[in-house]
């Protein structure tokens, strides 16, 4: 409530999303923000991050995306090469993400990056909140076979972030990311959105 929400139970969110989808409402842009990013910020985020992002997420004004997959790594999330380098000014992010859903419509990316030089696999990873309008970010669309634009490549060229942009504990990004991903299938969005589309196709046939 202190950041503009209603402190309601997750099952109540489930019911609201169910009704929105049943009515065909366009709620997809906000799913990641309220379902995954906000709970992670509440649990692990700095006070500055909570103040910067949670009120806007509660109002539906801030949309987020998740920066996980990278080129050449397939579905191996432990193969992250995008780096976070600590400097006197803050953190410098360099690298690339791919297959990022909705990056072109998002205000913030929650990214899993390698913060410890020389670390391997799931060790030495941290999570950062990256404003998508920050200098040094380039977004390139990936157009699917149907001509739609949903996925993106995102490039980071020495993107500067403040200290508070790190979410949680340095080097504990893997544990935090797996906890966050447990929320990804916590709602009815996937199957109900498909059901609405299937019904529309049947009606149009």
Report each predicted region and the residues it spans.
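A short, Trp-centered hydrophobic/proline-enriched beta-strand micro-motif
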Residues: 60-68, 112
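A short core secondary-structure module
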Residues: 94-140
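Short Gly/Pro-enriched turn/cap motifs at secondary-structure boundaries
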Residues: 30, 57, 72-75, 99-102, ...
């Amino acid at each position: 409530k202190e950041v503009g929400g209603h402190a309601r139970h997750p099952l109540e969110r489930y019911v609201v999303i169910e009704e929105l989808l049943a009515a065909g409402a366009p709620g997809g842009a906000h799913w990641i923000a309220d379902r995954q990013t906000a709970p992670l910020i509440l649990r692990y985020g700095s006070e500055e991050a909570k103040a910067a992002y949670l009120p806007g997420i509660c109002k539906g004004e801030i949309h987020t995306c998740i920066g996980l997959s990278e080129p050449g790594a397939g579905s191996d999330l432990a193969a992250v090469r995008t780096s976070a380098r600590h400097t006197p000014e803050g953190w410098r992010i360099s690298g690339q993400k791919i297959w990022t859903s909705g990056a072109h419509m998002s205000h913030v990316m929650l990214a899993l990056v390698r913060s410890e030089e020389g670390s391997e696999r799931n060790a030495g990873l941290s999570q950062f909140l990256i404003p998508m309008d920050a200098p040094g970010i380039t977004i390139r669309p990936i157009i699917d076979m149907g001509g739609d634009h949903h996925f993106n490549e995102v490039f980071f060229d020495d993107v500067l972030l403040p200290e508070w942009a790190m979410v949680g504990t340095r080097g504990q990004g893997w544990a935090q990311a797996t906890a966050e991903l447990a929320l990804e299938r916590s709602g009815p969005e996937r199957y109900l959105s498909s059901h609405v589309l299937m019904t529309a196709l049947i009606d149009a046939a």
